[in-house]
UniProtKB/Swiss-Prot annotation:
Residues passing through the membrane, by range: none
Family indicated by similarity: Belongs to the acetokinase family. TdcD subfamily.
Subunit-level organization: Homodimer.
Sequence positions that bind ATP: 11, 18, 175, 203-207, 278-280, 326-330
Binding site for Mg(2+): 11
Alphabetical keyword list: ATP-binding, Kinase, Magnesium, Metal-binding, Nucleotide-binding, Transferase
GO biological process entries: acetate metabolic process; L-threonine catabolic process to propionate
Protein name (database record): Propionate kinase
Entry GO CC: cytosol
Chain positions recorded as substrate binding sites: 86
């Protein structure tokens, strides 16, 4: 084993590979980057925010080869002791992270029809990493596994039983790695005992979800069988009356596939504003008086507040509301508006703390006389994946969480 082992974290998307290299002691990021445009002529690699370099080979393996070469240039290639893979969907098979074996790969393949765009890409990443890093232990970390502690009444749909029994149609939830990391950090920040605590975590980004965490376990979450359910998002509609979609399809002669495209790619902040799916653009328009941008933000906030309050009903006690994700960590406006909507819970905002930039890191943003503590905790999914890899794998280094 290398004296200074590192963990390579890989997140393969439908056309990209995001990667990070973290030291195995403190899980500090040593390098990070993205290969994008995979399987196209425009494929490129960018490392540490640098200029994109065109990839000679456009496949997942070609992109990983280029990433391995970058590690070699930095004398890190021989230090890779473990590889952690983010896997989009583990179905009801995986309730925790797992060391990758032939059986694990086969089970990932079995549940891949539940998330075909991402899981098959995840499998390509695993297979390519096995070829390029023979003998290096690999670990799969599932975005759905944290939510496998939900009770049937929380994950079942009100559909005929045969669809659950025969097809596995149920709520699985996503962003689990983020919700798990943030809830663990929240117990420290809020001085809570994990075994007797109640949190609602709001992961707000272009994709967004809420999670109720009781005694350290997920008991409810807003996303469902797919990431479409729940909150309104950048381009996703979130909760929508299926009858409305059936009526639109009938009136406009559109197919089910057309409707799926509409609710996934053309809705949400983009759909209402008609301007952008990027909240930063909409916030600027908000201050300029753009009415539909303002309406999009108000609708976004209303859904978030409603889901936070609803998820609190799954807890025995509400100790804290935690904001995370790109929007949750950076948008002073969204946090303020959401907390104002939650006055019914006795939540009060400290405007000065809320206005601090995200560079201030973990912080409490509620006032001292609030009934429920509100906080901002930057997520760190890469660190969570690396920690899981270290805990499951074999690496000769002392590990520190904080």
């Amino acid at each position: 084993m290398n004296e200074f082992p590192v963990v390579l974290v890989i997140n393969c998307g439908s056309s990209s590979i995001k990667f990070s290299v973290l030291d195995a002691t403190h899980c500090d990021v040593l390098m990070a980057g993205i290969a994008d445009g995979i399987n196209s002529e425009d494929a490129f690699l960018s490392v540490n925010g640098g200029e994109p370099a065109k990839l000679a080979h456009h496949s997942y393996e070609g992109a990983l080869k280029a990433i391995a070469f970058e590690l070699e240039k930095r004398n890190l290639i021989d230090s890779v002791a473990l590889i952690g893979h983010r896997i989009a969907h583990g179905g009801n098979i995986f309730t925790a992270s797992a060391i990758i074996t032939d059986e694990v790969i086969e089970n990932i393949r079995r549940v891949s029809p539940l998330a075909p765009l991402h899981n098959y890409a995840n499998l390509s990443g695993i297979e390519s990493a096995q070829h390029l890093f023979p003998g290096v232990q690999q670990v799969a970390v599932f975005d759905t596994s944290f939510h496998q502690t939900m009770a049937p009444e929380a994950y079942l749909y009100g559909l005929p039983w045969k669809y659950f029994e025969e097809l596995g149609v149920r709520r699985y939830g996503f962003h689990g790695t983020s919700h798990r990391y943030v809830s663990q950090r929240a117990h420290d920040l809020l001085a809570l005992q994990e075994e007797d605590s109640g949190l609602v975590v709001a992961h707000l980004g272009n994709g967004a979800s809420i999670c109720a965490v009781r005694n350290g376990q997920s008991v409810d979450t807003s996303m469902g069988m797919t990431p479409l359910e729940g909150l309104m998002m950048g381009t996703r509609s979130g909760d929508v009356d299926f009858g409305a979609m059936a009526w639109i399809a009938s009136e406009t002669n559109q197919t089910l596939g057309d409707m799926e495209r509409v609710v996934n790619k053309e809705s949400g902040l983009l759909g209402i504003s008609g301007l952008s799916s990027d909240l930063r653009v909409l916030e600027k328009a908000w201050h300029e008086g753009h009415e539909r941008a303002q309406l999009a933000i108000k609708t976004f906030v209303h859904r978030i507040a409603r889901h936070i309050a609803g998820h609190a009903a799954s807890l025995h006690r509400l100790d804290g509301i935690i904001f995370t994700g790109g929007i949750g960590e950076n948008s002073v406006l969204i946090r303020r508006l959401v907390i104002e909507h939650l006055a019914v819970l006795g939540v009060k905002l400290d405007h000065e703390m809320n206005s601090l930039p995200n560079s201030h890191g973990e912080r409490i943003i509620s006032s001292k006389d609030t009934n429920v503590i509100c906080a901002v905790i930057p997520t760190n999914e890469e660190k969570m994946i690396a920690l899981d890899a270290i805990h499951l794998g074999k690496v000769n280094a002392p590990v520190e969480f904080a």
